[in-house]
Amino acid sequence: MSWLSNTIQKLCRVTLLSAGSNPLPAISATSTTVRQLSHAERRARGPTVRRYGYKDKIFKSGLLPHLDNGQKLPMPVYRPKNPWSEKRALFGQNDYIDILGNDRLHPVRVMYSVPSWLRGVSGNEYQVLLRKRRLLEKSKYPIARPTKWRDMQKRILYLYKFLNRKTKTGYSKQ
């Protein structure tokens, strides 16, 4: 737009000069004068309102939360834990069974809360699912849970395709 306003100003000057009248000062169409407030005027206006309409939802009355009457909330009463409760006393009981216990007992044999197809498995998701399918296909699992069985089959098929397409294999020994 500046080229348009400059062109109009030039045309006006040319017409005014050719008419013989006094030339008027150039009027800028894009610039407007803004008067800056002095420091005293800004202070007189009061504080600048920022984030209008935002309400702080936190306590602003001190470090600890306060009640409406201004008193601090009391510290909770200290109740020591019972170190000899069953849960705490037996925590980690099988951690060193292979060092301290019988040589013939492997730590995998003491994993009681782990499903049989997952006990002692090391491998990626595809290998774990293949092992699960091999162990569960002869049981009632496919009939009792057909949706989960189908989802597992679909996941195995997807992983098979993905691993064959996207992963590198080593050099062939042939």
UniProtKB/Swiss-Prot annotation:
One of its GO terms (cellular component) is mitochondrial large ribosomal subunit. GO terms for molecular function: structural constituent of ribosome. It comes from the Eukaryota. Keywords: Mitochondrion, Ribonucleoprotein, Ribosomal protein, Transit peptide. It is found in: Mitochondrion. InterPro entries: Ribosomal_mL51 (IPR019373). One of its GO terms (biological process) is translation. Residues 1-46 form a transit peptide. Its main location: mitochondrion. Component of the mitochondrial ribosome large subunit (39S) which comprises a 16S rRNA and about 50 distinct proteins. Belongs to the mitochondrion-specific ribosomal protein mL51 family. This is Large ribosomal subunit protein mL51. It comes from Drosophila pseudoobscura pseudoobscura (Fruit fly).
